[in-house]
Amino acid sequence: MKMKQISDTTLKITISLEDLMDRGMEIADFLVPQEKTEEFFYAILDELEMPDSFLDTGMLSFRVTPKPDKVDVFVTKSKIDQNLDFEDLSDLPDMEELAQMSPDEFIKTLEKSIADKTKDDIEAIQSLEQVEAKEEEQEQAEQEAESKKEPYIYYILSFAKLADLVAFAKTVTFEMETSELYKMNERYYLTILVDIENHPSPYPAWLLARMREFADDSDISRSVLQEYGQVLMSHDAVLNLQKIG
């Protein structure tokens, strides 16, 4: 379970299904407002240590968005009082004016006063809906980017001397699918294909930094090497170079 402050008036709390079960809750509990749900909301706010700006601010509005593996709860500060009191409706006429009103005029005046009082609350809800829509778009974009991520990366390294190439090959201990060796314009080029699918996202950059300790990263693509370079080893180049000397 984690909390993120989106703005001065809005918090986003993400609750996993496991967290829900640990607290005796399930998604169906959020479909119909009930005392159990409200108690749960305030309990998790206490547990997550709500920011000071949200303390003692009166009523809070909760908006729940169920997901397949979690529940997102958006919490917004509300300016409306939980119990509306006629004394709070300062725009209402005094008793003498009220006595002269028809029932229709009284109802319209009362509705206007309540509408003015709840305007801030309505705006907060509308703002919350906009925040939720942006969060949805961001999550969808991240999921699409993740799905498009290639599971393999070709690293292409450049060496001025064959001895440097052999020395580098002997330092390689990471797993690779295959490797190739080309020669072009009096330089040696080593391509290394690595499966990154089951590695953390920083792994490709970490691996490249490690390679750069012994070799130069190249701007030349594999397709250029295939077309214009001389193929010295078409597969398992690193393994074969490790056998030298």
Curated annotation (Swiss-Prot):
Residue stretches in coiled coil: none
Pfam families according to UniProt: MecA
GO terms for MF: protein-macromolecule adaptor activity
Disulfide bonds: none
Highest taxon of source: Bacteria
Gene3D superfamilies the UniProt entry points to: 3.30.70.1950
Description of its domains: The N-terminal domain probably binds unfolded/aggregated proteins; the C-terminal domain interacts with ClpC.
Purpose of the protein: Enables the recognition and targeting of unfolded and aggregated proteins to the ClpC protease or to other proteins involved in proteolysis.
PANTHER family registered for this protein in UniProt: ADAPTER PROTEIN MECA (PTHR39161), ADAPTER PROTEIN MECA 1 (PTHR39161:SF1)
Summary of subunit composition and partner proteins: Homodimer.
Family that this chain belongs to: Belongs to the MecA family.
HAMAP family linked: MecA
Protein name (record): Adapter protein MecA
